[in-house]
Amino acid sequence: MSESAEHLKDEGSKTQSMIAGATAGLIARFVIAPLDVVKIRLQLQSHSASDPLSQRDLRGSPIYKGTIPTIKRIFREEGLAALWKGNVPAELMYVSYSAIQFTTYRSVTLGLQDAFGEHRLPAAAESFIAGASAGAVATTATYPLDLLRTRFAAQGIERVYTSLRSSIRDIAISEGPRGFFQGLGAGVGQIVPYMGIFFATYESLRLPMGTLNMPFGSADASAGVIASVIAKTGIFPFDLIRKRLQVQGPTRERYVHKNIPVYNGVFQTMRHILHNEGYRGLYRGLTVSLFKSAPASAVTMWTYERVLGILLKWEKSQELSK
């Protein structure tokens, strides 16, 4: 945790928050990229490995079961690089998202403090509002990159898109501007409570855990892991719905899963999944998602705190040298 700072949101300038957030996002994304590909493949799988009746219309689609077997199968059939499919738009998304998220979080919190003055909101409420606002703004601003990441990760041996440039051109021509925002409603519906719960939990744990003298400055990382697990489990169905909506359109039957159903809107998608796959269908990929989110949040928050601390020390040294 950075020195002499009571709250994450009070630390550093807007530029410092943006640099630290972007750096944290870049590093975290590369570390968890293979787990992200596995999660997306499992989320898009509408058939069950344990239900033969759901496998009647596979159309050549693979049957994935579990994190490790899925990693092995992707590696065997598509090669090592396949575990980083969609990493270019994902890196761009994570860097942009993290920078916007931390900057907005700080700005909203300071705005709330100015608005309420001496009658400041409780810390948990303040963190929830700032976190939810930051999540909504960052999600909307970077959503086209999120959609591209999903579509690239969903590609099997057959390549639907050959490059980032071609994917943007093809979607713009065949689906129009709205094609880049398919599933945005589910994305915002997911991220607002997620970020609110995440930051409120993180802020409530960060200072108490900071007094435990954990090795390697791991208190920030541990708080990030716990906050991420709690938040991710609560909103996971919306994340799955978002992924299935993102691969709708003229290329729907060309991804690794050839039998992805036609979905229209968040609630119709949820009803369809519940009717055909049951409640478990809404939680496909949850385990790997938690495995992914925990290290991602730990790396993100640990890196953010370290980079911000370095920037603050550098700024202080510059002031002293004048």
Swiss-Prot record:
It is a multi-pass membrane protein. The keyword Transcription does not apply. GO terms for biological process: transmembrane transport. It holds the Pfam family Mito_carr. Its main location: mitochondrion. GO terms for cellular component: mitochondrial inner membrane. The chain crosses the membrane at residues 18-38, 92-108, 128-148, 180-200, 221-241, 285-302. Keywords: Membrane, Mitochondrion, Mitochondrion inner membrane, Repeat, Transmembrane, Transmembrane helix, Transport. Solcar repeats lie at residues 12-111, 122-208, 215-310. InterPro entries: Mit_carrier (IPR002067), Mitochondrial_sb/sol_carrier (IPR018108), Mt_carrier_dom_sf (IPR023395). It is found in: Mitochondrion inner membrane. PANTHER family: SOLUTE CARRIER FAMILY 25. Mitochondrial transporter that mediates uptake of thiamine pyrophosphate (ThPP) into mitochondria. Belongs to the mitochondrial carrier (TC 2.A.29) family. This is Mitochondrial thiamine pyrophosphate carrier 1.
